[in-house]
UniProtKB/Swiss-Prot annotation:
<dbReference type="InterPro" id="IPR003699">
    <property type="entry name" value="QueA"/>
</dbReference>
<keyword id="KW-0949">S-adenosyl-L-methionine</keyword>
<comment type="function">
    <text>Transfers and isomerizes the ribose moiety from AdoMet to the 7-aminomethyl group of 7-deazaguanine (preQ1-tRNA) to give epoxyqueuosine (oQ-tRNA).</text>
</comment>
<dbReference type="InterPro" id="IPR036100">
    <property type="entry name" value="QueA_sf"/>
</dbReference>
<dbReference type="InterPro" id="IPR042119">
    <property type="entry name" value="QueA_dom2"/>
</dbReference>
<keyword id="KW-0963">Cytoplasm</keyword>
<dbReference type="GO" id="GO:0008616">
    <property type="term" value="P:queuosine biosynthetic process"/>
</dbReference>
<comment type="similarity">
    <text>Belongs to the QueA family.</text>
</comment>
<dbReference type="GO" id="GO:0005737">
    <property type="term" value="C:cytoplasm"/>
</dbReference>
<dbReference type="GO" id="GO:0002099">
    <property type="term" value="P:tRNA wobble guanine modification"/>
</dbReference>
<comment type="pathway">
    <text>tRNA modification; tRNA-queuosine biosynthesis.</text>
</comment>
<dbReference type="Pfam" id="PF02547">
    <property type="entry name" value="Queuosine_synth"/>
</dbReference>
<comment type="subunit">
    <text>Monomer.</text>
</comment>
<keyword id="KW-0671">Queuosine biosynthesis</keyword>
<protein>
    <recommendedName>
        <fullName>S-adenosylmethionine:tRNA ribosyltransferase-isomerase</fullName>
        <ecNumber>2.4.99.17</ecNumber>
    </recommendedName>
</protein>
<dbReference type="GO" id="GO:0051075">
    <property type="term" value="F:S-adenosylmethionine:tRNA ribosyltransferase-isomerase activity"/>
</dbReference>
<dbReference type="InterPro" id="IPR042118">
    <property type="entry name" value="QueA_dom1"/>
</dbReference>
């Protein structure tokens, strides 16, 4: 399958640079996957499309302030470090700029000595394995010294870092926000629950690979990045009971979708409480084992996420919906508007 089939023209001014003042004031494009019918609404109308008994599954991962600026202890040269993956015991896989300054044995200091790290190794992809040295609680120090690693297509400064977190973010570990959840406020989630919709949570720590373009010409040749996930027993029970009773399971975001499908596909269409790493790649031709619907943002041309939504709703339906979204000047990407596929 040619990657070019998932390309579309996107004017740069439609890439949202700032979150809206009110999370729920974004727009909502509703796409019926069976008919291809498209409806334009405000996000607050999402509740009208949800039914009592639906299970709405959200990713509760919290974005780390993973960008650190420090200095080499020997020369004072500036170093930028981006945390990618915790390896345990204060060791992290990181990206470093400029990489040539960070050889094994190099020590970097942050925040007047509040935090230090030593480079231990170079990865196959050019990253660095570092070990952090500190006194106190690592994540509290990181909150103090680190900054949010915003996506490469957002050029504006973020005034309030909490606007790049969902209101239910809990489990630290993501390098990027699960952005479909940014549209919700706590009161709106309470309204949805009051309608009889069951709210459930999974954790998938979003990696920077989510922004990596597809470099292969053929969809099937693309290799996905791996991300860590967890599914708790409470979510397993809610989802499995819903599937057994013919009720709908709707994922908030592609990360929730990939978590559900990773485990559901491996267990005959049922969930089990588990954790692990997933590199599942969902594209047209994939048969969904758990998912009935998806709330998501508008994604990059030729991205694996456009391929995922095309697998759920049909490529022609999705590309037509994206064309309409551009014509109607929907806001795209992380701080943009939402799309509901049912």
């Amino acid at each position: 399958m040619d990657v070019q089939q998932f390309d579309f023209d996107l004017p740069e001014h439609l890439i949202a640079q700032h979150p809206l003042e009110d999370r729920t004031s974004s727009r909502l494009l509703v796409l019926e996957k069976q008919t291809g019918n498209i409806v334009h609404q405000q996000f607050t109308h999402l509740i009208d499309h949800l039914q009592a008994g639906d299970v709405l599954v959200m990713n509760d991962s919290r974005v780390l302030p993973a960008r650190l600026i420090g200095e080499k202890t020997d020369t004072g040269a500036k170093i930028e470090i981006l945390l990618l993956k915790s390896l345990g015991e204060d060791r992290w896989e990181t990206l470093v700029k400029p990489g040539k300054r960070m050889k094994p044995g190099t020590e970097v200091v942050f925040g007047n000595g509040l935090l230090r790290c030593v480079c231990e190794d170079v990865t196959e992809t050019g990253g660095r394995i570092v070990r952090f040295l500190y006194e106190g609680i690592f994540y509290e120090i990181l909150d103090q010294l680190g900054s949010m690693p915003l996506p490469p297509y957002i050029h504006a400064q973020l005034e309030d870092s909490e606007r790049y977190q969902t209101v239910y973010a809990k489990e630290r570990g993501s390098a990027a926000a699960p952005t479909a959840g940014l549209h919700f406020t706590k009161p709106y989630l309470e309204q949805i629950a009051a309608k009889g919709v069951q709210l459930a949570y999974v954790t998938l720590h979003v990696g920077l690979g989510t922004f990596r373009p597809v470099s292969a010409d053929s969809v099937e040749e693309h290799v996905m990045h791996a991300e860590y996930y967890e599914i708790p027993e409470e979510t397993v029970e809610l989802v499995n009971q819903a599937k057994a009773e013919g009720r709908r399971v709707i994922a908030v975001g592609t990360t929730s979708c990939r978590t559900l499908e990773t485990v559901g596909r491996a267990n005959g269409g049922k969930l089990v409480a588990t954790s692990g790493w997933t590199d599942i790649f969902i594209y047209p031709g994939y048969t969904f084992s758990i998912l009935d619907g998806l709330l998501t943002n508008f994604h990059l041309p030729k991205s694996t996420l456009v391929m995922l939504v095309s697998a759920l709703a049909g490529k022609e339906n999705v590309m037509r919906a994206y064309k309409r979204a551009v014509e109607e000047e929907y806001r795209f990407f992380s701080f943009g508007d939402a799309m509901l596929i049912l």
